[in-house]
Amino acid sequence: MTAVRLKDIRKSYGSVKVIHGVDLDIEEGEFIVFVGPSGCGKSTLLRMIAGLEDISGGTLEIGGEVVNDVPPSKRGIAMVFQSYALYPHMTVYDNMAFGMRIAREKKEEIDRRVRSAASILQLTDYLDRLPKALSGGQRQRVAIGRAICRDPKVFLFDEPLSNLDAALRVATRIEIAKLSEAMPDTTMIYVTHDQVEAMTLADRIVVLSGGRIEQVGAPMELYERPANLFVAKFIGSPAMNILPAKIVDTGAKTTVTLPQDRRVTLDIATPESQKSAAVSFGVRPEDLTIATGEQFIIEGTISIIEALGEVTLLYVEGLSGEEPLIVKLPGNQPYQRGDKVRLTADPAKLHLFDAEGKALR
């Protein structure tokens, strides 16, 4: 088992700073997912851990050893990329065994590792096939198997599902989850822009933006208690609805005014100094419901309906011209475009963010 420690890790290309002092402790056997928009630095951070990018500043430890200047081959890591990079003229067995043969491992040890990895990944029946006879998902599993055969201290995954279609992406994601369960003592670091992968695979998620960590936590912690406006809008699909608001009452509970001069009281404590402060009011689409009485947050007209079978998404245009709110309701719904609706939510499910975007608790 191997822990990974990042201490004030920085990366610059000339005068351009791309990673700004990242501090992160990854525990032994933990499955960590780096997630964020394009250009946030997640792949750069992974490549620095792998040794494929030089570290401009800070300290990287793997298994208690500082590895800043240790070459990639000596770090005890194995990496799986977006591209499978399989040798087309070699069988699955030979592709998985190739690295060990180059390292001059014993034939018996090579065979044991290949067959063990094939068993974990359900590839035993395909060992004699060429890559062209495999599906995209099976090819990616061969690439993962090749990494397993290295018997690494740490697995690094750089967007391994990006080249797969939707169905294969789901199937291969499940295989990676099974792999994590089958190898509970192996530390895994996974990069993706897909929050579904992050939410379903991770023990903890690291949300990155602009080369900085915005929040680290368990998937549901980030979903239910985002640290700031960026995380609130990035985690969750559809994204959290955000409305401009103003605090009018503070204390153990907070009252705000919303567009349409609606007043809403939230189960959030704020100090007296926040009175009259401009804030952002947030509510997730699935936490909104259609109000039947006079108690509601906002009202508007349904402009778009997306019936997805499992759920229905309503896009509600407010009477004051603000951005449409998205309402996520279960199953099929009887509403029509042009219907006027009033929306409400459980006060415990509402969020507030200050002018800098920091969550108010």
Model-derived segments and their meaning:
Residues 50:
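Helix-to-loop junction immediately C-terminal to a conserved catalytic motif
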Residues 43-46, 142:
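ABC ATPase nucleotide-binding domain helices that frame the ATP-binding cleft
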Residues 58-66:
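Conserved ABC transporter NBD signature motif
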Residues 253-305, 331-361:
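Glycine/charge-rich catalytic "coupling/switch" loops of P-loop NTPases
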Residues 35-37:
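The feature captures the beta-strand-to-loop junction immediately N-terminal to the Walker
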Residues 31, 75-78, 82, 86-230:
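ABC ATPase nucleotide-binding domains
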Residues 56-59, 210, 350:
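Conserved coupling/switch loops of ABC nucleotide-binding domains, chiefly the family-specific signature
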